[in-house]
């Protein structure tokens, strides 16, 4: 014997009882009596109607067995060496004081700035040297030669 469950109230529907409602998207709703069918059609929320199973579950009514909470295993992060950095180096870097870390960072930034400045100066000097050897500047159009106008042909 197949016992169905009311889509609205959650009550049991025994064979030969209840009605079916098939929505346009072919979803089937079963109702135990006209009361739950009517409330469903009025678009009432079963969690707000005191006698439904959903309300009772939602508001923790009735006898409920104490379900032992499932203990989730906490993941522990394991530190592993990365390519180019050994485990000791990583631990050493992590244990550095913020002031020391800040000083190191500023030192590196200063060094990078100096390096960029030197590169820029070298590039500028090279550009000045190459500009001195060049005689006069030509545009691409001048280099190609003057545009030749095609003579118009007539019939």
Swiss-Prot record:
Compositionally biased spans, kind Basic and acidic residues: 89-129
Subcellular location: Cytoplasm
Subcellular location, principal: cytoplasm
Additional remark text: Present with 247000 molecules/cell in log phase SD medium. There are 2 genes for eL24 in yeast.
Gene3D superfamilies on file: 6.10.250.1270, Ribosomal protein L24e
GO biological processes: cytoplasmic translation; translational elongation; translational initiation
GO (cellular component) term, any one: cytosolic large ribosomal subunit
Feature: compositional bias, Polar residues: 131-142
Cysteine pairings via disulfide bonds: none
Subunit architecture: Component of the large ribosomal subunit (LSU). Mature yeast ribosomes consist of a small (40S) and a large (60S) subunit. The 40S small subunit contains 1 molecule of ribosomal RNA (18S rRNA) and 33 different proteins (encoded by 57 genes). The large 60S subunit contains 3 rRNA molecules (25S, 5.8S and 5S rRNA) and 46 different proteins (encoded by 81 genes).
Biological role: Component of the ribosome, a large ribonucleoprotein complex responsible for the synthesis of proteins in the cell. The small ribosomal subunit (SSU) binds messenger RNAs (mRNAs) and translates the encoded message by selecting cognate aminoacyl-transfer RNA (tRNA) molecules. The large subunit (LSU) contains the ribosomal catalytic site termed the peptidyl transferase center (PTC), which catalyzes the formation of peptide bonds, thereby polymerizing the amino acids delivered by tRNAs into a polypeptide chain.
Modification type Phosphoserine: residues: 7
Similarity-based family: Belongs to the eukaryotic ribosomal protein eL24 family.
InterPro entries for the chain: L24e/L24_sf, Ribosomal_eL24, Ribosomal_eL24-rel_N, Ribosomal_eL24_CS
Region of interest: Disordered: 66-155
GO MF, any single term: mRNA binding
Keywords of this entry: Cytoplasm, Phosphoprotein, Ribonucleoprotein, Ribosomal protein
Protein name from the UniProt record: Large ribosomal subunit protein eL24A
């Amino acid at each position: 014997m197949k016992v169905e469950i009311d889509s609205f109230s959650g009550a049991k529907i025994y064979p030969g009882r209840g009605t079916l409602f098939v929505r346009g998207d072919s979803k089937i709703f079963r109702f135990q009596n006209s009361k739950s069918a009517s409330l469903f059609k009025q678009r009432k929320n079963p969690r707000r109607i005191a006698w439904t199973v959903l309300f009772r579950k939602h508001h923790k009514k009735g006898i409920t067995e104490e379900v032992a909470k499932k203990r989730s295993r906490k993941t522990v992060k394991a530190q592993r060496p990365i390519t180019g950095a050994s485990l000791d180096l990583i631990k050493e870097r992590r244990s550095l004081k913020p002031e020391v870390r800040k000083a190191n960072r500023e030192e590196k930034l200063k060094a990078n700035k100096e390096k960029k400045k030197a590169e820029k100066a070298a590039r500028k000097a090279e550009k000045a040297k190459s500009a001195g050897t060049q005689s006069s500047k030509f545009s691409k159009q001048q280099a190609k030669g003057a545009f030749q106008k095609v003579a118009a042909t007539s019939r």
